[in-house]
Each structure stands twice: as structure tokens, then as C-alpha cells.
Amino acid sequence: DLAGQDLTALTSDHLVIGLFDPVWDARPAQAVAATGAAVLSLDLVPRSTRAQAVDVLSSTATVVGFQAVLMAAERYPKLFPLLITAAGTIPPAKIVVLGAGVAGLQAMAIARRLGATVEGFDIRPEALEQIRSLGARSIEIEGPEGQETPEEQNARNQAGLIPYLAAADIVFTAAAIPGVRSPILVTETMVDAMKPGSLLVDLSAQRGGNCVYTQANEETLHGDVTILGPTNLASDMALSASRMFANNMVNLVRMLSNEGSLTIDRKDDVIEPMLVAIGGEIVHERVQQNLASATSPEVAS
């Protein structure tokens, strides 16, 4: 984190690149902007083909999804694959993944490679084919023909997921919305329906979690269900995570390079969405709204 002496060294000639997360809490980026330095936030990378080369969040999520499955496999007292032995047949572990973003899809892929049966769910119709492409079964919850409110859809999905969670050995939740609290996917009723000894790994714990019982960086026991809320799984795979981050940064510097110097092109469709501040002013619309409403979670508390 930049503070104190670090900030006093900055001038309008500097460009500061980092994971400021300014839509969640604008104050760190605002403090840097006050020095006149330009600010690029890596968590504001747009979703486009060209931007993938600098998408730090996707790189991190890839590592998180991988490590989450390994952690669960170590914690859960059951083998993942189907085994037919002289001592009898051992059925495969049943895994449910809620959220088919980068971390969720990676978790599905790794769990499948370890031999588990995997089911995946996402509210986005386009994600269903991605789930199936990994060899997982897509969970599809039928809805009414007419228009539903978001609240009605959420309640229907939660009720429809109960049988799947009740049959699962391990549940991963990986639904996140940039800049806001993680949506609640798993309610008290859903946890109560899970079988004794089952495990829930919440990959969105840093923003409150997708499960009502999740505590960041804590292990919570509700009944006979264990709920894990890790927030920094990427550090457990530091070599790979650092390599991917370094490659993202190299690609970003190449985008910024212009005849031997770094130039911020306000017309660039990757750079402009990442630009939080320049010339001492906050220029990102959502960050401006954050500051105007003063509703950053830390401010509101």
C-alpha cells in the first residue's frame, strides 16, 4: 500500500499502476491522484479479447480455482475418483460449483481431472456451454414463462439448488460482482440441507462471501458442515501467480510504450477504462460516483 513517504515522492511525472479497487474504496486511489500522478487500476481491465493479455484478475482467478480444489481434496476425507478395488468400489466425490467465472471454471476443470463428478451452475445462459465443455453437468433451473424480478429469480434459483447441494460432498462458490458485495447464493436453509461432513469453500469471502455463514480467512462449522473462507489462495501458488502477473505487466507496458516512453492514450479501448486519475483529477465515472456518494464500505462503516 502507498502511504506517507511513498506518496510524498510522487509527482505529476509519475504513473502508478496497481490493484487499487477504487470502485469498492476510492480513497487509496484518491490519495495518489492528489499528488498529480496518473493512476491505472488493474482491476478495471475491460472484458475484451485485446484486454485479456493484461487481465490480472483472470490470471489470479485461474490460480485460485486450481488451489481451491487441491485444498478441498486435502481437507475432505474421501477420494475424488471412482476406484474399483479388491476391497470394493469407491464412488467418486460429488462436487457442485456455483459461479462459472474464471475461478469457478478452473475449479470444475481441476476437479474433473481428479476424477470427481462435477455439476456447475451460473445464472448466465452463455455460461452453460462453458460448463459442459469441461465435462461437467450444467445445472439448469426452470423458470416461469413470464418476466421475473431479480428477487424472484434469486429465490427460485436458491430453492432449485437445494437438492444438488444436499447430494454434494463439496460445494465451491465463486460468484463475484466487481465493486460490490458478493451476492448471497447459499442461504441458511441451503446449508441445513447439506449432508453431514460436507465441505463448502467460498472463493468470494473477501467481499462478504456467497454463503451466509462465511467468515473471511476463517473455518466455520455450522451443524456438521464445514465452511472455509480463504481470501489469498493465489499466494499458495506464488511462483505461478507471480509469473502470470509479470506477464500481464509486460503486456501492459508494451501497450503504454510509445517511442521509448510511457504514454497514456485516452482513446485506447484498454487503457482508458483502467484510467482512474490523471493531472490530479479523478476521471473514472464510477469512481467519481463512489466519492460523491461516500458509500465505500469502509467509509459507510
Where are the model-predicted features located?
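An N-terminal-biased, well-structured beta-alpha scaffold segment characteristic
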Residues: 1-31
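Rossmann-fold NAD(P)-binding glycine/threonine-rich loop
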Residues: 20-54, 180-237
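Glycine-rich phosphate/diphosphate-binding loop of Rossmann-like nucleotide-binding domains
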Residues: 79-168
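Residue-level detector of alpha-helix initiation sites
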Residues: 23, 63, 101-102
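Alpha-helix C-terminal capping/helix-to-coil transition sites in glycosyltransferase folds
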Residues: 12, 166-167, 195-196
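Short glycine/serine/threonine-rich phosphate/pyrophosphate-binding segments
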Residues: 103-110, 128, 174-175, 179-185, ...
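A structured beta-alpha segment of the ubiquitous adenosine-cofactor-binding alpha/beta core
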Residues: 2, 144-171, 175-192, 230
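Adenosine-phosphate binding glycine-rich loop
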Residues: 43-87, 211-300
